[in-house]
From Swiss-Prot:
Disulfide bonds: none annotated. HAMAP family: ATP_synth_delta_bact. This is ATP synthase subunit delta. F-type ATPases have 2 components, F(1) - the catalytic core - and F(0) - the membrane proton channel. F(1) has five subunits: alpha(3), beta(3), gamma(1), delta(1), epsilon(1). F(0) has three main subunits: a(1), b(2) and c(10-14). The alpha and beta chains form an alternating ring which encloses part of the gamma chain. F(1) is attached to F(0) by a central stalk formed by the gamma and epsilon chains, while a peripheral stalk is formed by the delta and b chains. The gene is atpH. It comes from Streptococcus pyogenes serotype M3 (strain ATCC BAA-595 / MGAS315). It is found in: Cell membrane.
Length: 178
């Protein structure tokens, strides 16, 4: 992706978030974006929208199906994407919208990797640790299970990481023995 395309994607995302923020609709916008992104992840919609083999009329039909029960701002955004023929960048634009919402609201997704699934109590403790250590509000809690950690956990928020895994501690111990 070129710098020009990246700047375009970020500008579309930033503009949509600004409009929603002015109208106090960030939560609604975030829900709309997450629902559409889920559609992208469960289908090959991104490939269809970015393919030159798919006619523009088909892309219009696909995006019309996405409109559904979205907010006015999201539907207007999708119409704008269609008018400017930027369908190929929609997935990246929606990702940019989520990033911009996180920046504006200081609410970031939290990824927790542990050797075993977390209990509800542990999840609430993770949210408290994130709020205290990272000074951000925890958004979605994305849980991953990796038995190779042996024990402990890895918390990742906004490109910052806390790694208390036994695996890392063993690696550090091994390096100290050398």
């Amino acid at each position: 992706m070129t710098k020009k395309e990246q700047a375009l994607i970020e500008q579309y995302g930033k503009s949509l978030v600004e409009v929603a923020s002015e109208h106090h609709s960030l939560d609604t916008l975030q829900a709309d974006v997450l629902a559409i992104l889920e559609t992208f992840e469960t289908t090959n919609l991104d490939q269809s929208l970015s393919s030159l083999a798919v006619p523009h009329a088909e892309k219009i039909k696909l995006l019309t199906l996405l409109k559904g029960n979205n907010s006015v701002y999201m539907n207007n955004f999708l119409n704008l994407i269609l008018q400017n023929e930027r369908e190929a960048y929609l997935y990246q634009m929606l990702q940019a919208v989520l990033n911009e919402i996180a920046i504006v609201s200081n609410q970031y997704d939290v990824t927790v990797t542990s050797s075993l699934p977390l209990t509800e109590e542990q999840k609430s403790r993770v949210r408290a640790v994130v709020a205290k250590k990272f000074a951000v509000t925890a958004g979605r809690l994305i849980e991953k299970v990796d038995p190779s950690l042996i024990g402990g956990f890895i918390i990742s928020v906004n490109n910052k990481v806390i790694d208390t895994s036994i695996r890392r501690q063993l690696q550090a111990f091994k390096m100290n023995l050398k």
